[in-house]
């Protein structure tokens, strides 16, 4: 128990007169001090600081002096460097602190042994994270798992573009999300989440254009969109598993406006192109995967291409719908954050045999516009065009596969910050809030 100095200063004579009254008063009034004193069985340990933070003497309170006058021979002054018996510690934490401070590691008490091991583990983690060269299992290099990871992600493993992009944006995120398969528990909320919104908007666009005879007839596109939105919004809560919130009507109105602008701009952007495939899968079910040759061997890929268009010359354009607008530029492919578009272009040509892709773009649904990256005009180093984009993606795939099999998962926040949906966002020591 800690008795500290109050606002009163009493001389010795006053204390002798009032000491019994003070203790009687403490016992009679409800409060933690009275409760503790009343509950004493055989022993009571009272403590107080005798030095302030600046080193000056800490004056005792009149409560302390009243108690001390009754037991003058029981007062001991303990200094920090004094060796004390561990059984006199007030808590397991204090006992462990004393043992470490006195360089006496516990050998008999199992509880203290486990606590000491836990503290030592934490010290090793902290040292690893403070080191100039960030290596070891606590900095994303669990090298003891190399053999296991190499077997799990062998040449027979089926990859998706999103998993590759996960490693490309932050290797630690891939490790937590895919290798460890950890998920952050989310509190139930009203309304849809990001994934549900993306699925809903993808389905609306796919159904809007799939049912059209002439995808260039803007009026027909608008009428098709209106009918599809009415059906999809009515079924969305049940189909995607969310509970509509009080703003659901307003959200439908906002999404409707965005989708109308989206299809109008998409029709204009698609002059000379005709949709020939929607939600085209490869590497799923009976459809063969994309077999990509890399320096790490053959890599098997699967995916869903949102839309494939063809022009009058029989050439292909690959479209990938995105709900958000982050990381849709040329530099995101160069950095390895976005690999989907060139991989899907290669999948359309090689796995599906649909023809020769000459263009590809991300389409931002909510903004109603194309992303900055266009495969036909992509340029990196001395390479130009769609083949340059495919080769850039191939190099990233090789780097990623090699890193995964070598158990290299350093936490590297992507440019612009980390996504809030990263499963490690609650505890990652390198987490930087971003998009």
Each model region followed by its residue ranges:
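Charged, amphipathic alpha-helical linkers/stalks
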Residues: 85-98
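Conserved helicase C-terminal RecA-like lobe
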Residues: 1-39, 329
């Amino acid at each position: 128990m800690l008795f500290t100095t109050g606002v009163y200063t009493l001389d010795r004579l006053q204390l002798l007169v009032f000491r019994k009254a003070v203790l009687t008063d403490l016992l009679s009034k409800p409060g933690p001090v009275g409760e503790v004193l009343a509950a004493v069985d055989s022993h009571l340990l009272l403590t107080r600081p005798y030095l302030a933070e600046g080193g000056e003497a800490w004056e005792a309170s009149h409560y302390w002096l009243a108690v001390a006058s009754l037991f003058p021979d029981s007062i001991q002054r303990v200094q920090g460097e004094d060796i004390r018996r561990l059984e006199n510690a007030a808590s397991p934490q204090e006992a462990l602190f004393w043992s470490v401070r006195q360089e006496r590691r516990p050998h008999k008490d199992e509880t203290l042994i486990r606590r000491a091991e836990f503290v030592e583990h934490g010290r090793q983690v902290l040292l690893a994270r403070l080191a100039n060269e960030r290596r070891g299992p606590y900095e994303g290099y669990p090298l003891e798992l190399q053999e296991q990871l190499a077997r799990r992600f062998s040449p027979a493993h089926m990859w998706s573009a999103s998993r590759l992009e996960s490693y490309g944006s932050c290797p630690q995120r891939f490790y937590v999300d895919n290798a460890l398969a950890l998920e952050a528990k989310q509190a139930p909320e009203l309304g849809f989440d990001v994934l549900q919104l993306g699925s809903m908007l993808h389905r609306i666009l796919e159904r809007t254009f799939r049912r059209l005879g002439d995808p260039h007839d803007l009026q027909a596109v608008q009428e098709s969109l209106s009918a599809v939105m009415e059906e999809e919004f009515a079924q969305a809560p049940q189909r995607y598993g969310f509970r509509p919130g009080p703003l659901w009507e307003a959200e439908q109105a906002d999404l409707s406006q965005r989708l109308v602008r989206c299809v109008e701009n998409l029709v204009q952007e698609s002059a000379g192109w005709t949709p020939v495939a929607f939600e085209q899968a490869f590497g799923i079910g009976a459809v063969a995967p994309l077999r990509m040759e890399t320096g790490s061997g053959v890599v098997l890929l699967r995916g869903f291409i949102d839309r494939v268009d063809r022009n009058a010359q029989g050439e292909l354009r690959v479209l990938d719908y995105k709900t958000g607008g982050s990381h849709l530029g040329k530099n995101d492919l160069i950095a390895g954050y976005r690999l989907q578009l060139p991989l899907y272009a290669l999948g359309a040509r090689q796995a599906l045999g649909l023809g020769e892709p000459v263009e590809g773009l991300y389409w931002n649904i909510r903004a109603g516009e194309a992303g900055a990256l266009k495969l036909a005009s992509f340029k990196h180093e001395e390479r130009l065009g769609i083949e340059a984009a495919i080769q850039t993606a191939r190099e990233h795939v090789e780097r990623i596969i090699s890193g995964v099999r070598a158990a290299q998962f350093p936490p590297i926040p992507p440019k612009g910050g980390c996504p809030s949906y990263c499963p490690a966002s609650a505890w990652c020591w390198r987490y930087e809030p971003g998009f």
